[in-house]
Design a protein with these regions (language model features):
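Charged, solvent-exposed interaction patches on well-folded alpha/beta domains
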Residues: 2-166
Length: 166
């Protein structure tokens, strides 16, 4: 059963057995067409959404098994639990990956980005958020971390439904 991650059986002298069962933990949702499944950290489907209590999991949008494996590799480099819990969705775009955070911030990344760069990215993100700055995207695909702030000066001066006020 894919819900079982590990089983350990020990014989305790003279005639006792100790059985330890470690269950797989929900890691993320997998979107396949219009269906959503819960997967573990190695990409095995093991539950439907309504079967788990933790609903704060990222959505993986993978077109095929290779994309899923690559996305899981990207996610495995995000060690910070606060960062991971802020991920809304991750998907492959051409040969790179886009991570969408809960507040709409986009992180552009690649499969070769390591955990240290993700740590630095999250620290930068937190400092910008604490200064009430809005980030459009953070790009980790280059040697240095690049970012683009949202231009808050652009406001909708048009009518409520988008039409000019004439």
């Amino acid at each position: 059963d894919v819900r079982i991650k590990n089983i350990e059986i020990k014989k305790v002298y003279p005639s006792e057995l100790v059985v330890k069962i470690e269950e797989s933990k929900p890691y993320s949702y997998l979107r396949q067409g219009n269906n959503f499944y819960v997967i573990n950290d190695v990409g095995e489907i093991f539950a439907y959404i309504d079967e788990i209590s933790n609903k704060n999991l990222p959505i993986i949008d993978a077109a095929n098994k290779d994309d899923l494996e690559d996305i899981l590799q990207v996610l495995s480099n995000i060690k910070n639990e606060n960062f991971f819990s802020n991920i809304s969705e991750i998907k492959k775009v051409k040969s790179d990956y886009e991570i969408l955070l809960n507040d709409g911030t986009l992180i552009k990344t690649s499969i070769v980005v390591n955990h240290t760069k993700y740590e630095n990215c999250f620290k930068l993100y937190q400092s910008l958020i604490s200064e009430n700055k809005k980030v459009e995207y953070i790009d980790l695909r280059f040697k240095d971390i690049n970012l683009k702030e949202r231009d808050l000066s652009q406001t909708n001066l048009e009518g409520k439904d988008g039409r000019d006020l004439k």
